[in-house]
Amino acid sequence: MRKILSTIFGLILLTAWVQAEPLSPADVKSLLARIRDMRVKSPHVQADFREEKTIRLMNKPIVSAGKVWFHPPNKFRREVRGNSPSVTVSDGQQLWIYYANFKSAEHYSLGKRSPVDAAIAAVNTALNLENVENTFQISGRKIDNGYELELLPRSPSMKRIFQRFNIRINSELLVERTEMVQPNGDRLVTTYSNQTRAPIPASTFEFTPPPGTEITTPLGR
C-alpha cells in the first residue's frame, strides 16, 4: 500500500515561509476560484518531475525522476526512468503499475471503495482543489513568484493518509512543488519542471501489459 501511495503522491506535484505574505480567507477563496477556472479552460497538464522520498527507517532519501501526464479528475500517467523504471497508468476505472525490470504488473480496479480509491480521491481533491474547503483546512501565502498553500485534512480517513499537504503554485497557476507528510513521519517532496497545458492524446491513459508480463491483483479484484 505504501508503494501505491508514494506513486500516486508523486504525481500528481516547498520553499521556506520566510518573507511570505499571508493570504486572508477571502484571498485564498479567490485564488482557488482562479485555479479552478484555469483548469476548466486548460485541463491537461504534463511535466517532468523529480521526487525525493524520505522514510524514517532509511538513512538516505529515495530519489526518482521521470514524466507525468494528468487529466482531471482521475486520469494520469507517470513514467519513472533510471535503474528502476516503472509506469503507472490510470484511466479512471483501473490502475496499472508496470515494473519493466521484473516484467511484472499490478492491476487494481477502481470505484470499489478500496484503500487505493481512498488514496486517489484524497490526492485528487488536494490537487484539483474541487470542494477542497470541505475536506481540508487551508491557509496560504503570497511569495515572490506565486503562492504556497498548506492543506490540513479534516476527516479521520484523510488524516490516516497524510498529516499535511503543501503546494507551491507559480504565477501561471501551475504546481511547481508539493510536499506530503504522512502520519508515520515519512515525507515525499516532488518538484515539477517544463510544465505545459498542451492537449494530451486519450491513448496516453491506456495501458496494455507487454506479452509475457506476470500480472497480480493485490486487492484480489
Where are these regions (language model features)?
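Positively charged n-region of N-terminal signal peptides that target proteins for export
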Residues: M1-I4
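Short beta-strands and strand-coil junctions in structured, solvent-facing domains, enriched
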Residues: R56-L57, R77, S84-S86, I97, ...
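An acidic-aromatic
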Residues: K67-A119, L188
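Extracytoplasmic segments of membrane-associated envelope/inner-membrane machinery
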Residues: Y98-A100, A105-R141, E148-E150
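Gly/Pro-enriched, hydrophobic low-complexity segments
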Residues: E106, N131-G220
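N-terminal leader/targeting segments and the immediate start of mature chains
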Residues: A16-P61, P209-R221
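Bacterial N-terminal signal peptides
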Residues: T7-A16
